């Protein structure tokens, strides 16, 4: 979303590349950080609102990898967390695993296993989190902002901690291209707080995006220094 990316874009002063993905709605912002190329890709907009969810994220990721050939993809955005796991509003986590939580397909080791995803994350994620003093958690993805009891059942069964709407879709595309992916997630709402999800999300979005900006700066500096050393 623009709200998630804008503070980061403004921090680095990177510029929009008009029409790069045309006719697709995805948007590219490009710049340089300490000699490394930094590309920020947004899903784009339709009907005057940000495109969110798995479909838009898949299109943007596929297009970006095919056109830009990145060394690593960073899926940076907001998420829901759980009080019982120690999450706080605007706290930023690094993802250590990723899967879908709303694909209810029977059949272990066939469609059921495939539908959950469990795609690989960048092997350097743990070292980065340790170096930056950030917690880690398992990202689970669904196509709705709220969470149904059946979603929670899957999340708890598989140890999910960070609930979003795009992460596993991005991970799926990255797995097809064998492109490393790093997850950086800032908490906007606490799924077990009893508060209405959209209201809590809206109330905390700005705060979460500001903390995400700070974390992104640290992450980019780390990646530039370690991937291009």
Predicted regions and their residues:
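Conserved active-site and cofactor/substrate-binding residues in soluble primary-metabolism enzymes
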Residues: 3, 52-59, 68, 165-168, ...
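His/Asp/Glu-rich mid-to-C-terminal helical/loop segments that flank catalytic regions of hydrolases
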Residues: 193-229
């Amino acid at each position: 979303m623009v709200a998630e990316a804008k503070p980061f874009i403004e921090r680095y002063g990177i510029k929009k590349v008009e029409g790069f993905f045309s006719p697709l709605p995805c948007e590219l912002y490009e710049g340089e950080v300490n000699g490394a190329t930094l590309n920020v890709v947004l899903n784009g907009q339709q009907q005057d609102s940000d495109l969110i969810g798995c479909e838009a994220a898949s299109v943007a990721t596929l297009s970006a990898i095919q056109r830009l050939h990145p060394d690593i993809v960073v899926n940076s955005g907001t998420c829901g967390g759980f009080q019982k796991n120690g999450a706080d509003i605007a706290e930023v986590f690094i993802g250590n695993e990723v899967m879908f939580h709303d694909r209810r397909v029977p059949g272990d080791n066939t469609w059921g296993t495939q539908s959950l995803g469990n795609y690989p994350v960048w092997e350097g994620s743990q070292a980065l989190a340790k170096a930056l003093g950030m917690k880690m958690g398992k990202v689970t993805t669904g196509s709705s902002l709220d969470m149904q009891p059946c979603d929670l059942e899957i999340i708890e069964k598989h140890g999910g901690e960070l609930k979003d709407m795009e992460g596993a879709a991005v991970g799926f595309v990255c797995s097809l291209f064998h492109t490393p992916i790093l997850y950086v997630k800032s908490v906007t709402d606490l799924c077990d707080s009893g508060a209405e999800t959209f209201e809590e999300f809206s109330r905390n979005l700005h705060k979460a995006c500001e903390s995400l900006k700070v974390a992104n700066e640290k992450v980019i500096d780390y990646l530039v220094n370690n991937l291009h050393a």
